[in-house]
Amino acid sequence: MIIKKELIKREIAGDTILVPVGKTVYDSNGLFVLNELGVFIWDLLPNVETQEEICQAILKEYEVSEEEAKKDVAEFLNKLRQLNVI
């Protein structure tokens, strides 16, 4: 998947945060804090084409149902789309 905005992932005070850089600073509403699953999905984005690929990776890494994985991925990607990140 293509990440549209310039964001750098940083660890700050124990939290993983996406920090806007470049022109994105002016277009952004601030920092984006990611939970553990958000970090996992974010790291996958450059290497996957579909939502299904992300779900399959989650099922291999975490003990969750397929339904829960699909729901979590859909919510995360929808949020990124709303923010015009992907």
Place the predicted regions along the sequence by residue.
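Acidic, low-complexity/disordered tracts enriched in E/D and polar residues
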Residues: 1-43
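Long, charge-rich, low-complexity alpha-helical segments
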Residues: 30-86
